[in-house]
Amino acid sequence: MADVSMRQMLEAGVHFGHQTRFWDPKMRPYIFGERNKIHIINLEKTLPLYKDALNFAGRLASNGGKILFVGTKRPARELVREHAARCGMPYVDHRWLGGMMTNFRTVKHSIARLKDLETQAEDGTFDKVTKREALALSREREKLDRSLSGIKNMERLPDAMFVVDVGYEHIAISEAKKLGIPVIGVVDTNCSPREVDYVIPGNDDAIRAIELYVSGIADAVIEAKQASSHAAAAGKDDFVEINDTAS
């Protein structure tokens, strides 16, 4: 697992919360104090909780579990897309469509339509229709791709959800809770941690802080997958060796 230090969190600005007048009292246990009317998050609480989240993500990944990365606000989009793709996990980086999880069966039809349009674009079908029809198909494809490209290879509901800003993504979290999907969430001082299973108290606006969270989860997933793969290969070698001895 990637070794993250308190110094790295400080340098990334993880400890900076929101203005004190916007705070959520449920975040009181994670707040160190205030400075210039800004709440300061207690990194002595954040660091072990972040490591708990990394361990959970790693355990899931080692067993073949899928974690859906969710970050649709502007500072998070590119980082979520980059690191989710890097570790082979699905993601939502544009806009959370209502019912994306609770009505997943219908969403799968839209994914099938997207894949069909991609095939048509590649095999020359668009060239065989009128310019107006081709333009309409291209626009439909772009719209679906913008919303669904990160989950188009997700065959089933995820085993967990990782959310960068729990306030901004409250609809996604609500759907996850209805379905019993565990949530890993970055929770700033203006949000409630109540619906989050693995709370990461921290700044959810600074790009460096967001990158620390997202890259750390991705690294934990990659390391767990590699360890699982190596263990499986070692077990296979042992099995072959036993057979050879027996013969």
Swiss-Prot record:
One Gene Ontology cellular component annotation held by this UniProt entry: cytosolic small ribosomal subunit
Gene Ontology molecular-function annotations: structural constituent of ribosome
Keywords: Ribonucleoprotein, Ribosomal protein
Pfam families per UniProt: Ribosomal_S2
GO biological process, one term: translation
Database matches in InterPro entries: Ribosomal_uS2, Ribosomal_uS2_bac/mit/plastid, Ribosomal_uS2_CS, Ribosomal_uS2_flav_dom_sf
Stated family: Belongs to the universal ribosomal protein uS2 family.
Protein name: Small ribosomal subunit protein uS2
Organism phylogeny: Bacteria, Pseudomonadati, Pseudomonadota, Gammaproteobacteria, Chromatiales
Gene: rpsB
